[in-house]
Regions:
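Residues forming the flavin
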Residues: 4, 12-67, 71-354
Length: 354
């Protein structure tokens, strides 16, 4: 297996997209299929498959709060149905499906870091039959939870196992919010893997997908279990300390683990080291690896009573609605931007780095 070789392939499945389907707060689940069929000009029974692609809450008018859905549907004759549909909310749609082929190779790829990037890299490699080895400087999520709680209770900081380092990455303790782009076709696949391992179905279509730390730790544990069941290996409390090269190509790495330092041969190396492994950055910089600074945020947490935010956003308290949120952004002529961030209500000064 050569470095950089794509180990997945995908194919587009033709479906129909129906957008801007309005549901009232008290509508039943069957109403979505009925209204999608109405937009298409067909009977509900003619829809073979319906998948929610996006759901958002329109609360701009507090007297008229409602849900807006986009769904993909499969019918017996898509082309005929599209021609017959008169609604502007109906269009042709391609559902992208990934297929991970099996690859035969005696070489085992090495992944450094077991945060989101490293975890999904190892998951795909495992499903391809490549039995990756993961090197993670922190500890497993259960031990990590104990160390974090001990620190928050006034205990001692473990520099290698804390809210920044360990299985699941820094986001494991940030309430499980999922930040993704909107254009990459791989996003839906990744959300599907979270759902497959225990995340609620709503993350597949909500505009601001959210899991929660209490659920996320179990998901992380489940993904690790699948990787191991497919022949992968996760080495916790193990730190990358050096990279060996020959002729401009990686030939191996140096690792310091619980039982001391050792060398590990490898020709395929994935660095998923996150944003806080500064000693690793220094080592990579010494090897001449190109890198550049990234903008960062710093700030304080603003706490409100959830009932006050619900009242301000919805005009009343609706038990059937999710917790309301808000965001504010203030641009300035300086190099800083002030903004709040989703439900956590973090007020951040973001510095622009040239």
């Amino acid at each position: 297996m050569g470095v950089g070789k794509r180990i997945y392939r995908g194919e587009a499945r033709k479906m129909i997209l129906v957008r801007n389907i309005r549901l009232e707060l008290g509508d039943s689940a069957d109403a979505l299929r009925d209204k999608a069929a109405s937009e298409l000009g067909i009977a509900p029974r003619e829809i073979k498959e319906l998948k929610i692609k996006k759901r958002s809450l329109d609360a701009r008018k507090k007297s008229d709060i409602h849900w807006l859905y986009s769904v993909s549907v499969s019918v017996r004759n898509e082309e005929k149905t599209l021609k017959r549909a008169k609604s502007r909310n109906v269009c042709e749609y391609e559902e992208f499906e990934y297929q991970i082929p099996q690859i035969k190779s005696a070489e085992r790829p090495v992944v450094i870091g077991f945060g989101p990037a490293g975890m999904f890299a190892a998951l795909v490699l495992s499903r391809a039959g490549l039995r990756p080895i993961v090197i993670e400087r922190g500890c497993d999520v259960d031990t990590r939870m104990e160390r974090v709680e001990a620190f928050r209770s006034g205990g001692e900081l473990d520099p290698e196992c804390n809210v920044q380092f360990g299985e699941g990455g820094a986001g494991t303790f940030s309430d499980g919010k999922l930040n993704t782009g909107i254009k990459d076709k791989r996003i839906s696949w990744m959300l599907e893997q979270f759902h497959r391992h225990g995340a609620p179905e709503e993350i597949l279509y909500d505009g601001k997908p959210h899991i929660g730390t209490d659920i996320l730790t179990g998901i992380v544990r489940s993904i690790r279990g699948e990787i191991i069941s497919l022949g992968g290996e996760i080495r916790f409390n193990s730190k990358l300390t050096g990279i060996k090269t020959e002729g401009g190509a990686v030939t191996g790495i140096e690792v310091t683990g619980k039982n001391g330092a050792y060398a590990l041969p490898c020709r395929c190396l994935i660095l998923a080291i996150g944003h806080s492994a500064r000693d690793t950055f220094e080592m990579l910089n010494g090897l001449g690896v190109p890198m550049e600074p990234k903008a960062f945020s710093m700030g304080v947490r603003i706490e409100h009573k959830q009932a006050d935010i619900d009242l301000a956003q919805y005009g009343a308290v609706y038990p059937s609605l999710p917790a309301a949120d808000y965001s504010l952004t203030q641009e300035s002529d300086t190099e800083f931007t002030l903004k709040t961030v989703n439900n956590d209500q973090w007020s951040c000064l973001t510095k622009k780095v040239n």
